[in-house]
Amino acid sequence: MKDNTDKNIKGEAVCSGNFSKTGLVLEGGAMRGMFTAGVLDVLMENEIYTDGVVGVSAGAVFGCNYKSRQIGRTIRYNKRFAGDWRYCSIRSLLKTGDIYGADFCYNRIPNELDVFDLESYKKNPIPFYVAASDCRTGKCVYKKLETCGENDLKWMRASASMPLASRPVEVDGYKLLDGGMTDSIPLEFFEKLGFSRNIVVLTQPRDYKKSPNALMPFKKCR
């Protein structure tokens, strides 16, 4: 007889007919994302896994390690390369057009210096989404990253490409920048996908309200 049960985030068996999907929503925030990294490590250390993840900006870049189940990786490589100009620096911005060096962050680190576990990522069935801002429409677009291969990494980079400090990323017919501009906390997006319960990891106080960036009019000069 088929066992029609699933397990919730506590590992308890629940009837699939009444199963309520639990999502994990990760806000961005550049290096404030180290807080997110710590939360994700604690969740993994306690074997708490949700049914899906959506990340924005740093939440996307760091959240992929939750799907690949690499405890400590985010904090480890950030500590190792924090002082390396190729990782994040004004020199990188002037030399490459990106304050976070695209080749170093999305090629050298995951493929050579602190290897990302692609096989574990692909074998893990939970869906992982990122959010990015469409430069042409001003709307948020969402992408499910199936393999974390080259094309998926372009979407991840786009999600974390801060305006004024990064080049727009062109992928799949879009020209994209940081998803935090259009949907910094994509809770509503996940609720529409059927995730009725969600763990939301914030990197700002709950009463924080985003104000217009006075430098945004100068973006057209880049």
What feature does the model see in each segment?
Residues 1-56, 64-222:
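Patatin-like phospholipase
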